[in-house]
């Protein structure tokens, strides 16, 4: 069914402006009478952050910025959905055009700049769907003009954590000036101390919510050492590796590769997977990792798992491969478990040391 929908609609959507096509897709998913997916293979179940995921494949933040259609996305077969990025106050983000398809490279460049309707809309929609169940995380970020960005994250934890399965502290978007400076050791330590204190206040009312940190792929290895050390000391529940990159790998063919913004999709895969493995060896199983960046096939998903991800996310590949990719990836992971004769957990991190020994991706 999803394959037929893809074949009928993708040519039309590809003819539209990318941002318009995305908005139309989200609206269609929101209102389409999608059936509930078949139950997942029990071998795909994952326990992480104190939560039980039916399968390891989620949709990354950015697809459903305003929490408009998380239940529709769960019905597509994702094991979890991450909405956002949501900021405290509404902000328009950067001027259009700000989303570019790199068709020749199967990549995407965006410079949205945390375009957000603000916390009020997200809170209302997430509150309304809370009874539906399913794992829905919320990715949060600071307003561009905020005088105290740490206070923005604290406010969002206090407001949105009660209606979220987990909350992601996004300090790695390249499209908000100065945001990535919050990954520096002293700034990150202060931010996480404030965020986790807010989490404890919320926990007294509704129970604890996992707090994850989303990092950039462009960190130097010494900077990654600092990030992991702070995250471990402050006892975050997990790290998402990684956001989009401001670098441009060698060999990009599409003329739009010159656009300013964060690059995602297939060209990000080598760098994102290397950073995932580097993070895994530093974390030493202190907490789980979510691997994201360039997953476009079952083989790519398995490479992320073997590099150290307990859970994985995708987004850009849906533009080029369609909605049928979700079932394809889950089937490929199940086959890999069969062939290995073990469990999904046995695959996690198997290749991390080998990945970190390879030459740095160019």
Residue ranges with predicted function:
Residues 3-46, 110-115, 120:
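An N-cap/entry alpha-helix motif that binds or orients negatively charged groups
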Residues 26, 30-32, 37-39, 174-187, ...:
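Glycine/Thr-rich beta-alpha phosphate-binding loop at enzyme active sites
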Residues 51-58, 132-140, 201-219, 281-291:
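Short beta-strand/loop segments at the ligand-binding rim of alpha/beta enzyme cores
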Residues 66-73, 154, 219-233, 281-285, ...:
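Catalytic cores of alpha/beta
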Residues 80-91, 171-173, 238-248, 301-330:
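Glycine-rich phosphate-binding active-site loops on the catalytic face of alpha/beta enzymes
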Residues 84-133:
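A gly/proline- and charged-residue-enriched helix-loop-helix capping module
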Residues 90-106, 249-261, 318-342:
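C-terminal helical cap(s) of enzyme catalytic domains, especially alpha/beta-barrels
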Residues 142-154, 181, 187, 213-233:
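Active-site glycine- and acidic-residue-rich loops that bind
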């Amino acid at each position: 069914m999803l394959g037929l929908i893809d074949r009928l609609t993708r040519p039309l959507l590809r003819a539209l402006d990318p941002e318009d096509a995305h908005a139309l897709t989200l609206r269609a998913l929101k209102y389409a009478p999608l059936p509930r997916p078949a139950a997942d293979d029990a071998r795909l179940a994952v326990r992480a952050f104190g939560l039980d995921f039916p399968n390891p494949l989620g949709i990354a933040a950015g697809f459903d910025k305003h929490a408009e259609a998380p239940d529709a996305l769960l019905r597509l077969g994702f094991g979890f959905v991450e909405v956002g990025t949501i900021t405290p106050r509404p902000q328009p983000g950067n001027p259009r055009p700000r989303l570019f398809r790199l068709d020749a490279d199967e990549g995407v460049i965006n410079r949205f700049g945390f375009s957000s309707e603000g916390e009020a809309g997200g809170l209302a929609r997430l509150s309304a769907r809370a009874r539906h169940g399913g794992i829905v995380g919320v990715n949060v970020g600071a307003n561009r003009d905020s005088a105290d960005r740490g206070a923005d994250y604290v406010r969002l934890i206090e407001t949105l954590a009660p209606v979220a399965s987990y909350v992601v502290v996004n300090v790695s978007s390249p499209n908000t000036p100065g945001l990535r400076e919050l990954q520096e050791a002293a700034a990150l330590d202060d931010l996480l101390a404030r965020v986790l204190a807010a989490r404890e206040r919320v926990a007294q009312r509704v129970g604890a919510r996992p707090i994850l940190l989303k990092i950039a792929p462009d960190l130097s290895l010494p900077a990654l050492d600092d990030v992991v050390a702070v995250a471990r000391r402050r006892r975050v529940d997990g790290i998402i590796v990684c956001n989009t990159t401001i670098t441009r790998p060698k060999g990009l063919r599409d003329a739009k590769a010159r656009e300013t913004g964060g690059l995602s999709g297939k060209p990000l895969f080598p760098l994102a997977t290397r950073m995932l493995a580097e993070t895994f060896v530093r974390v030493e199983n202190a907490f789980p990792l979510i691997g994201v960046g360039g997953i476009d096939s079952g083989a790519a998903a398995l490479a992320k798992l073997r590099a150290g991800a307990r859970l994985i996310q995708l987004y850009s590949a849906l533009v080029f491969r369609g909605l049928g990719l979700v079932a394809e990836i889950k089937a490929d992971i199940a086959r890999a478990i069969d062939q290995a004769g073990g469990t999904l957990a046995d695959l996690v991190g198997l290749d991390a040391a080998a990945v970190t020994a390879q030459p740095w991706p160019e």
